Curated annotation (Swiss-Prot):
Species classification: Bacteria, Pseudomonadati, Pseudomonadota, Gammaproteobacteria, Alteromonadales
InterPro entries: DeoD-type, Nucleoside_phosphorylase_CS, Nucleoside_phosphorylase_d, Nucleoside_phosphorylase_sf
UniProt KW Cytoplasm keyword: no
Protein name: Purine nucleoside phosphorylase DeoD-type
Reactions mediated catalytically: a purine D-ribonucleoside + phosphate = a purine nucleobase + alpha-D-ribose 1-phosphate; a purine 2'-deoxy-D-ribonucleoside + phosphate = a purine nucleobase + 2-deoxy-alpha-D-ribose 1-phosphate
Binding site for a purine D-ribonucleoside: H5, E180, M181, E182, S204, D205
EC number: 2.4.2.1
Length: 236
């Protein structure tokens, strides 16, 4: 049954959905890695696809940018389409010089300046953490593929253009590995509605050094991250 933001039919989505922010990255993942691909939704050009990877049914759909957009799609996928596992695959900015551009970060927890989880947790601080079984599966896949990765906290920012750059110093002191815009909201939605979620991101730019990747590279590369996530997804 269609929702206000997804026009897929019942049963169109697999139990596990890879969840990039960019709908064109969703299209790239589907066309590059999946077989027997079918586009299942296109409302507002937020594209979603279902296919198979090594014989296992997998879906991929864009989430848009930021916690509000991500939360809408995550909620509808879980509540209306019965999705059980949502794995964000995207990009982030690095803060520490110990983290390099193109490193893969697995977000065990997500700090945030958003109030969204306080709204769902009666004004209290909610510990936005990933599902351990998803984390374990992705770490195992990374180890088997020999992919370099880091596990730790990310920061989900409400503002891309921050008015408070000194906050980066605090994040580095507290060992936050990367800054992105969705994970804290995704983890909250998953907990609220009984699903599992994980955030896996590749460092696309470095806040300290100024090194960055191009928009084309962000859209169509970072294949190591996608491959290790898919390898984990078929074990769930």
């Amino acid at each position: 049954m269609a929702t206000p933001h997804i026009n897929a039919v019942d049963g169109a989505f697999a139990d596990t959905v890879l969840f990039p922010g960019d709908p064109l990255r969703a299209k790239y993942i589907a066309e590059t890695f999946l077989e027997n691909v079918e586009q299942v939704t296109d409302v507002r050009n937020m594209l979603g696809f279902t296919g198979t990877y090594k014989g296992v049914r997998i879906s991929v759909m864009g989430s848009g940018m930021g916690i509000p957009s991500c939360s809408i799609y995550a909620t509808e996928l879980i509540k209306d389409y019965g999705v059980k596992n949502l794995i964000r695959v995207g990009t982030c900015g690095a803060i520490s010089t110990d983290v390099k551009v193109r490193d893969v970060i697995i977000g065990m927890g997500a700090c945030t300046d958003s109030q969204v989880n306080r709204l769902r947790f009666k004004g209290q601080d909610f510990a936005a953490i990933c599902d351990y079984s998803l984390l374990s599966a992705v770490v195992k896949a990374a180890e088997e593929k020999g992919t370099k990765y880091r596990v730790g906290n990310v920061f989900s920012a409400d503002l891309f253009y921050t008015p408070d750059p000194e906050m980066f110093d605090v994040m580095e002191k507290m060992d936050v590995l990367g800054v992105e815009m969705e994970a804290a909201g995704l983890y909250g939605v998953a907990k609220e509605f009984g699903a599992k979620a994980l955030c896996v991101v590749t460092v696309s730019d470095h806040i300290r050094t100024g090194e960055k990747t191009s928009s084309d590279e962000r859209q169509t590369t970072f294949n190591e991250m996608i491959e290790m996530t898919l390898e984990a997804a078929i074990t769930l």
